[in-house]
Regions:
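Short amphipathic beta-strand/extended segments with alternating polar/hydrophobic composition
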Residues: 5, 42-49, 59-64, 167-174, ...
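Beta-strand/loop-rich accessory regions of lumenal/periplasmic or secreted enzymes
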Residues: 137, 189-595
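Post-signal-peptide, soluble extracytosolic/periplasmic N-terminal scaffold domains
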Residues: 26, 33-40, 53-56, 94-218
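Short, low-complexity cationic-aromatic patches
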Residues: 7-12, 67-73, 147-153, 162, ...
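Hydrophobic, ordered structural segments
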Residues: 73-94, 161-176, 265-269, 274
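Primary recognition of N-terminal secretory signal peptides and signal-anchoring hydrophobic helices
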Residues: 1-96
Length: 595
């Protein structure tokens, strides 16, 4: 038996206990040592040793790790002894809550209770967004810069959907009252998660749709997977009522290969009325056979190459701290919260410039997205998804997998938002925070002198949202040189169109690829764009900022000499939204500075 404090210790298996706790467990056979990683804690411990190394510092163990029949055992107090030792300083207790902290689960529930008690509230009402109603901007900056408390009650914005009618309310959580209740005219509400379920049920139980499926060789509607899509705006030319709550449904066949996206049921669109809970119209084109070639994407048909482990270690702990929802790294401080529509919102971003805390950005987030497709055919012409506004990209946050979606040294943050019933829902691993090496920051070698090089470090805030077939990855990247970058991209699966052509030598290939590219037998990837828009409320050294355009130009040389051309910069101020509406050109520069 093993004893602790004079009595027999209760031992539990190390692997199972630590993995259930959420820690990564690694065994070094050469060093005969365990490495345990959990959030900001990096622990090394040898079997039989009376000490462990936690973030580079020694910690006495009341009970050592014991090996028995080839398995490691630890005391049932091991997790508390090691991970609650205080040696991991990544997470700090927030003594003064930031005024932009997300609504807690309790606050979300309180907002729903208050709203449901209103006489205007209808039983069938659903919730599209419940979020913080932001206090006065000047007061928030005063808190961030001087620590001045914000003298305002916590307030919530509640957006609801009563049938097809959108309602916006503002709720005082402290005094438990509704400050405003505003029906929004001429607006469509977001597509909610239960709408997906409703559409699938409507399709599965429709005898009319089942008959149409037979034209495509499908006799079992239960194998049809639906994707509910917004109908777009065509000013009545599509024969649809713009004020109705409608979705267009394109379908795919589940063939059992785990990738129904590769099996589109082409030229078949069902128009579903969400209020009437029925199909009101079926739009068809020429029948195209469903591509049936198995195309799994989970690796079942591949032999992955054997690779040796790649480990990222921080043996002395993190270089950043997280206090509540505020993150501090080197000279940067910023607040982070998750919004159900736009995802992460970074606020009160400051940079410590030799002891002076300088304002950089009050708030930054994704503003919206649009994904327009360029194919005019019946199943494609209406596709121009507003992923953020129509579907809620924060709601569709994809939990991040450490070691795959983010490096193994990442800290994963859970976030809480409201679902369509108003119930608080926690998304595990919603945001990843990690530091990485990013090459040389500076290098110069002067002849006859020693080399001068400095390392570049970056702090990354990563978030992933899965909207249908696409998985969007967004990185906010903080550089130690005072730069903030945004990297946006997509992975997932291409949205494809079923066609007759198997190769580009087939008779129909030219027409089949008019609006896309043949990427597999009978499958075309249609031409489309992903356009990201970001909302950046920059306050560089204050709110009196000016946006300046700097356009490089080649001009004739008028200064004399043999050179015929020069490179100059045309600089001008952008002082209106009309001037700001410009075509994207990566060769131009936009400078925002304090004036």
């Amino acid at each position: 038996p093993v004893f602790a404090h004079g009595s027999e210790a209760h031992m539990v298996p190390l692997d199972k206990t630590l993995q259930e706790f959420g820690a990564d467990v690694q065994w070094d056979d050469y060093a005969q040592m365990f490495t345990l990683i959990k959030d900001g804690a990096y622990v090394k411990v040898k079997p039989g040793a009376k000490t462990a190394i936690v973030n580079g510092k020694s910690l006495d163990l009341p009970v050592p790790v014991v090996m028995k029949e080839g398995k490691a055992w630890v005391s049932d107090t091991f997790i508390n002894d090691v991970f609650q030792s205080g040696l991991d300083q990544t997470f700090q207790v927030e003594k003064r809550p930031h005024p932009l902290n997300s609504l807690s689960a309790a606050e979300i529930s309180e907002a729903v209770t208050i709203v449901k008690a209103a006489p205007e509230f209808q039983p069938n009402t659903r919730f599209t967004e419940i979020s913080l109603h932001e206090p006065d901007k000047a007061a928030v900056w005063a808190f961030a810069l001087q620590g001045t408390p914000v003298d305002a009650p916590r307030t919530a914005d509640v957006v609801m959907l009563d049938g097809k009618h959108v309602i916006e309310a503002v709720v005082d959580l402290q005094n438990k009252k509704i400050l405003s209740w505003t029906p929004i005219k001429g607006a469509h509400g977001m597509v909610l998660l239960d709408d997906f379920v409703s559409v699938q049920n409507i399709i599965n139980t429709s005898s009319e749709f089942a008959e149409v499926l037979k034209k495509h060789g499908i006799t079992d509607p239960g194998k049809v997977v639906t994707t509910p899509l917004t109908v777009g705006f065509f000013d009545g030319k599509d024969g649809l009522q713009q004020d109705a709550r409608l979705l267009k449904v394109v379908s795919y066949l589940d063939t059992g290969d785990g990738n129904y996206w590769a099996h589109p049921i082409e030229n078949l669109v069902a128009v579903v009325d969400l209020e009437a809970k029925k199909i009101i119209k079926i739009e068809e084109g020429p029948v195209i056979p469903v591509p049936m070639e198995p195309r799994p994407y989970d690796g079942r048909d591949r032999n992955a190459p054997a690779v040796k482990p790649l480990e990222i270690t921080e043996p002395e702990g993190k270089n950043y701290t997280i206090t509540g929802d505020t993150i501090h790294w080197q000279n940067w401080d910023f607040h982070l919260r998750l919004n159900s529509r736009v995802g992460p919102i970074l606020s009160t971003v400051t940079y410590n410039d030799n002891g002076t805390k300088r304002q950089v950005m009050y708030e930054g987030s994704l503003g919206g997205m649009i994904v327009p497709y360029g194919d005019p055919d019946v199943g494609w012409y209406f596709k121009a998804y507003l992923d953020s506004g129509d579907y809620g990209m924060g709601t569709l946050t994809s939990p991040i997998v450490r070691g795959k979606d983010a490096p193994s040294n990442a800290v994963l943050l859970d976030e809480t938002i409201a679902d369509y019933t108003g119930k608080p829902t926690t998304i595990p691993g919603a945001v990843a925070i990690f530091e990485r090496y990013a090459g040389p920051e500076y290098k110069h070698l002067e002849m006859g002198k020693p080399n001068v090089s400095t390392e570049r470090r970056e702090l990354v805030v990563r978030w992933i949202s899965t909207v249908g077939n696409y998985d969007y990855i967004f990185d906010w990247v903080f550089h130690d040189n005072g730069t903030i970058g945004i990297d946006a991209g997509a992975t997932g699966i291409e949205a494809v169109k079923g066609v007759l052509a198997k190769t580009m030598h087939d008779p129909s290939a030219k027409e089949d690829t008019r609006y896309g590219t043949l990427i597999d037998h009978n499958i075309v990837g249609t031409t489309h764009q992903h356009i990201y828009n970001f909302r950046l409320d920059l306050d560089v050294d204050g709110e009196n900022n000016t946006l300046v355009a700097m356009d490089p130009e080649v001009k004739p040389n008028t200064a004399g000499g043999p050179r015929t051309s020069t490179m100059q910069v045309n600089q001008y101020t952008i002082d209106s939204e009309q001037k700001a509406a410009q075509k994207f050109d990566p060769g131009t520069i936009r400078l925002l500075s304090n004036t």
